[in-house]
């Protein structure tokens, strides 16, 4: 095993995520601005080992990027809506077209009567109406939409629950450190 949790068996890499990687992911997803040295302190590894692990997690697409959470209301986006979109052909590039609309925050292809659920943010109901008429209904194959306005949000975010009990953390750390 190398320092980034990759195992080589008969020359083939088995890209596992060990508990140290999980700890790093848990730390970074809560605070992407945390220093490498602080992560190293928390997981009890050398900063160089942590940096290598983070680079490998990025290269493998497990860490897809870093961003700041901006308060929408401070920029005038006071209305959130969930829109069910029905199309004549589910798929058919519709998801990509919906995702290209700036006000659209999320696009999910779903099973059931509708083809997509999208989350949008607008400044008010008037701008929501314009968005529906001029952008969403203009997308190829859209035949119907059903809009639900969000009254209050209790939880919003993208933090994943990361299970840190998967393997014996201390055993992995000892192997990495050669102790």
Task: Give the positions of each predicted feature.
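A compositional/biophysical signature of low hydrophobicity enriched in polar/charged and small residues
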Residues: 1-179
């Amino acid at each position: 095993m190398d320092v980034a949790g990759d195992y080589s068996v008969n020359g083939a890499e088995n890209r596992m995520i060990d508990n140290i990687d999980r700890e790093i992911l848990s730390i970074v997803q809560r605070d992407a601005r945390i220093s490498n040295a602080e992560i190293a302190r928390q997981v009890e590894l050398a900063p160089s080992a942590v940096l290598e692990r983070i680079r490998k997690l990025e290269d493998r697409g497990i860490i897809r990027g870093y961003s700041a959470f901006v308060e929408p209301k401070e920029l005038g986006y006071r209305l959130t809506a969930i829109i069910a979109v029905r199309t004549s052909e589910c798929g058919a590039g519709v998801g990509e077209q919906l995702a290209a609309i700036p006000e659209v925050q999320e696009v999910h292809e779903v099973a059931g009567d509708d083809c997509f659920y999208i989350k949008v943010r607008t400044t008010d109901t008037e701008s929501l109406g314009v968005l529906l008429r001029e952008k969403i209904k203009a997308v190829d194959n859209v035949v119907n939409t059903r809009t639900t306005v969000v009254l209050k949000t209790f939880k919003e975010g993208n933090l994943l629950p990361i299970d840190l009990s998967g393997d014996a953390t201390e055993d992995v750390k000892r192997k990495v450190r050669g102790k």
